[in-house]
């Protein structure tokens, strides 16, 4: 697993993002005296997110959640009469897409400049039990004191 940390930075904000799960590791904001404070709960190093203590316990610190966020009861759902069985990772239910959700995956990352980051991931048909190939793009950007997160996804099946 090749971990990498990316930094978005301007005069107001500094954001550290990991390619594992698109995790927002740090978000430094400035107070009225211009002192920086990290307002994100998480670990000190990127490597700690790849350790079994994190990966096997599902804390989801700062991570992108998907393909589905929340619990699916009994880890199964039905579309047009077809039942889809999912990974059971939460007392017989499927939480945040199971043990191989987006939070546990290495994303492809492009950083065109200091204020923009583009993350991409393809989730193949049947991964985790979900139907359809899903192409996901997440954009992190900062402008002055605004941090934006834009999610886009397309799937080839309903």
For each feature predicted by the language model, list its residue ranges.
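Surface-exposed acidic/polar loop and edge beta-strand patches at domain peripheries
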Residues: 1-158
């Amino acid at each position: 697993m090749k971990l990498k940390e990316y930094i978005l930075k301007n005069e107001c904000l500094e954001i550290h993002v990991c390619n594992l799960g698109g995790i927002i590791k740090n978000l430094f904001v400035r107070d009225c005296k211009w002192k920086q404070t990290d307002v994100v709960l998480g670990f000190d190093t990127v490597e700690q997110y790849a350790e079994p203590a994190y990966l096997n316990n599902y804390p989801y610190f700062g991570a992108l959640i998907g393909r589905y966020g929340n619990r699916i009861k009994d880890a199964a759902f039905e579309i047009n009469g077809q039942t889809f069985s999912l990974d059971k990772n939460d007392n017989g239910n499927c939480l945040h897409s199971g043990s191989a959700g987006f939070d546990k995956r290495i994303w492809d990352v492009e950083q065109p400049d200091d204020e923009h980051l583009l993350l991409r991931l393809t989730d193949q048909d049947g991964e985790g039990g979900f139907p359809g190939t899903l192409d996901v793009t997440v954009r992190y950007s900062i402008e002055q004191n605004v941090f934006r997160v834009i999610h886009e996804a397309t799937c080839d099946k309903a």
